[in-house]
């Protein structure tokens, strides 16, 4: 049975109920679940003060569980980046720990990649996903398969026009606002020739465009093999838009960057999300409108898992839509 620790490294958990529900569901999925002692701490909008949250991260790293799953994102990891013991986290990855999350966890994933090249996992958050009332089938199934080493690829549908695309590169990215906040810091991994995956929430398309243009003008976008856009959810239209939306943002970006920009990736602040490795060489193939994103089993998982036989679950996500 794979050990799994739930910890809260950023925003405060307002209620304990979602944490209990998440622990129950994850146990049913077959994980040996433990909850970090400080998971429900409160300090202002954070899950405890900076020292407490930093120690929680280090405590999880020293425990070296099979899975380190954050309860939620919010805001708070940026405060800790200059103080995290990156080599301690990297040693936990080497020992087999899969660090999983998205949203504010992008800071941890980017920092770990920048400082140590250790891979992590883009995936659900315990309370936001496993702790909500209604849980879809794709999210837990994909997560469980990824955490046990059975998952080697995911699939989704994109727009027409990319048939025949076949490229390889380091899978990286995350929350767009978080990425922009890390540009120019020591916690920015200088990835060239990568597959850059992006998502965000509650950002109007003009703000999304401004952040994408920042990455473009910093030379980040043009140096990638492909850009894969997940969900940009929960934004409100303005009467000033006059037809301006996310589609026009993508069209404008495509006019500037000679790199394939794919949409439709099932990830971000949405109910259904896949789990994929971060900081691992990926293989992106498009057939018609079907996108298959695979990765090297040996590099995505620790040496403890190399004896397991991986399966190709391409199409895992889009068959459910």
Which role does the model predict for each range below?
Residues 190-246:
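Internal helical hairpin/lid segments
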Residues 1-64:
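ATP/NTP phosphate-donor binding region
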Residues 117-180, 184:
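Conserved anion/nucleotide-ligand pocket segment
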Residues 67-83, 102:
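N-terminal glycine-rich "phosphate-gripper" loop used for MgATP/nucleotide binding
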Residues 231-301:
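ATP/nucleoside-binding phosphotransfer catalytic cores, i.e., glycine-rich phosphate-binding loops
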Residues 299-321:
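Histidine-centered metal-binding segments
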Residues 86-111, 119-125, 260:
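Short, acidic/small-residue loops that bind anionic groups at enzyme active sites
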Residues 72-75, 203, 233, 267:
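Short glycine-rich anion-binding loops that position phosphate/pyrophosphate groups of nucleotides
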């Amino acid at each position: 049975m794979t050990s799994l620790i739930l910890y809260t490294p950023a925003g405060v958990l307002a209620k304990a109920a979602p944490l209990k529900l998440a622990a129950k569901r994850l146990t049913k999925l077959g994980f040996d679940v433990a909850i970090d002692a400080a998971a429900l701490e409160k300090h202002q909008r954070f899950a405890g003060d900076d020292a407490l949250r930093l120690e929680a991260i280090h405590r999880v790293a020293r425990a070296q569980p099979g899975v380190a799953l954050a309860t939620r994102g919010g805001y708070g990891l940026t405060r800790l980046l200059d103080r995290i013991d990156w080599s301690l986290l990297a040693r936990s990855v080497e020992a087999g720990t899969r660090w999983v999350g998205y949203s504010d966890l992008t800071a941890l994933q980017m920092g770990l990649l920048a400082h140590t090249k250790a891979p992590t996992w883009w995936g659900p958050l315990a309370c936001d996903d496993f702790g909500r009332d209604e849980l879809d089938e794709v999210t837990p199934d994909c997560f469980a398969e990824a955490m046990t080493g059975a998952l080697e690829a995911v699939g989704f549908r994109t727009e027409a026009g990319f048939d025949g695309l076949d490229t390889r590169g380091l899978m990286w990215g995350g929350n767009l606002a978080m990425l922009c906040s890390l540009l120019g810091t020591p916690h920015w991994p200088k990835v060239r020739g990568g597959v850059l995956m992006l998502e965000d929430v509650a950002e109007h398309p003009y703000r999304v465009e401004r952040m994408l243009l920042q990455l473009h003008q910093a030379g980040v976008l043009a140096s990638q093999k492909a850009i894969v856009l997940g969900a940009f959810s929960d934004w409100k239209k303005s009467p000033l838009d006059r037809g301006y939306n996310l589609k026009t943002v993508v069209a404008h970006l495509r006019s500037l960057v000679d790199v394939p920009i794919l949409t439709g990736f099932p990830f971000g602040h949405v109910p259904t999300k896949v789990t994929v490795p971060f900081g691992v060489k990926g293989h992106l193939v498009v057939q018609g409108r079907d996108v298959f994103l695979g990765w090297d089993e040996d590099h995505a998982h620790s040496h403890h898992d190399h004896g397991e036989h991986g399966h190709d679950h391409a199409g895992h996500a889009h068959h459910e839509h």
